[in-house]
């Protein structure tokens, strides 16, 4: 781990909070640590209880730290697409160096120039996506660094989000004792792992089925064109099963994962299991076919909502088909049901990395890949703060019985250039979030 970059992602979801520790070796990602805990304080992707959310973040961080003996101090944070809006942008700068060679500094300046636009006071910039760079009129350039020119332009997309939504999410991360290296819109991260470049160019819909919500993202011409969030996810299936089987939500979740099938026509009547009845000592017998009827009804409703959302957005031609990801996309039969509803090609995206080969980790892994790619373009390093430190930590062992203000831990030793490069940048973006 000596000279390689260690990056940590934090994916805050409704049903689970995931932490991935990745080691970048010659631009290749190795997963060396994973934290995955049930989340509290999140509903439909938004923070509803700061103390519960902070506690869940700390537990996930601890779990990942124990795997590798690493002291996690900074993270790449995924921001849900709730209330996200995409705006076209354009920036132009003169190349600053005397020899007219374009550097990372010029790329930063042209990105900053592209952000000079009128944004409502209740919104904040989350990401700036470069569609193409133009050097002295020559377009379709992905990376202009090292080229010679006088005039550098960038055409791109600015992603803005609700200032309040961002405030609450980032405040939880800060109160968990973590610094924020980078923030990334979750669909951008998911697309980095789930979609091939051909799929992004053709026109493909990425459907990320989370616990409390489902994110729909449309990619075409190499970049994201549209994103929206539906307030339905895997937790709704669990609640449906809980009601239908008259059992607890915990039991219903276990049954969904172990015996669930999304396509009624292919479900088995022979797969029988016992279900404890809530409030009594009795057990009822059910088979997979019976619960499949419940699951299929909810997922079919969700997929029809996806179709309607795309129709209202004016998206009709989808030559790249549909790609499913997120925890609920691992269910048996979901491909058959999706193909039946969408009448198009459908596949499930799974991260191809040891230890995280499940669709629920797509966003968390994608956060590292996306942030690393962007940091390279601007010459930034993201990993200065995380260090090997196998020291027992007391700060996150017990949850206090009484809710109280949690002071950020482990900030007493600032690193060289940290205020300027990382936290300073975040302060400029989200000034009033970090008031002392």
Annotated model-derived regions:
Residues 1-16, 20-75, 79-204, 247-250, ...:
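Nucleotide/phosphate-binding catalytic cleft detector across ATP-hydrolyzing
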Residues 16, 80, 161, 263, ...:
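Glycine-rich phosphate-binding loops at beta-strand->alpha-helix junctions
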Residues 10-16, 79-80, 206-213, 219-222, ...:
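A short acidic Gly-Thr/Ser loop motif
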Residues 152-153, 220-223, 314-321:
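Short, surface-exposed connector motifs at secondary-structure boundaries
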Residues 231-248:
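A conserved active-site cap/scaffold subdomain adjacent to cofactor or substrate pockets
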Residues 308-320, 331-346:
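ATP-binding/phosphotransfer module of carbohydrate and carboxylate kinases, centering on a glycine-rich
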Residues 9-10, 19, 77, 173, ...:
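Residue-level signature of catalytic and energy-coupling elements of molecular machines
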Residues 347, 351-392:
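Glycine-rich phosphate-binding/hydrolytic loop that grips phosphoryl groups
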